[in-house]
């Protein structure tokens, strides 16, 4: 399984990556996890190969909702999981 994490906070990205890797080890899954530090880097480097994208919403340069809308144009079937601590963004995520 290919997983992308788009998260500007290095500590949060590491925690999520560690959780994914522990899950993969526990259930004998092969997971390749790529971490992107912002939405611009992600859109520039992404090769439409992820099964799941964990997307932070509040990021510099371009927020995760805008990045996800761009992603949908090139990869309409990828699963996007929004990660945020800001309740006001929860409903807006369903639009993407």
Ranges and model annotations:
Residues 18, 29-31, 48-49, 57:
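Surface-exposed beta-strand edges and their flanking turn/coil or helix-capping segments
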Residues 26-37:
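Short hydrophobic/Thr-rich beta-strand motif most characteristic of the beta2 strand and flanking loop
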Residues 44, 50-96:
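CheY-like receiver
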């Amino acid at each position: 399984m290919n997983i992308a994490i788009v998260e500007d906070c290095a500590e949060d990205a590491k925690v999520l990556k560690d959780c994914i890797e522990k899950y993969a080890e526990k259930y004998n899954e092969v997971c390749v996890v790529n971490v992107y530090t912002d939405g611009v880097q992600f859109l520039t480097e992404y090769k439409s190969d992820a099964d799941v994208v964990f997307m932070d919403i509040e990021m510099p340069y371009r927020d995760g909702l805008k990045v996800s809308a761009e992603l949908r144009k090139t990869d309409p079937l990828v699963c996007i999981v929004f990660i945020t601590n800001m309740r006001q963004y929860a409903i807006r995520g369903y639009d993407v």
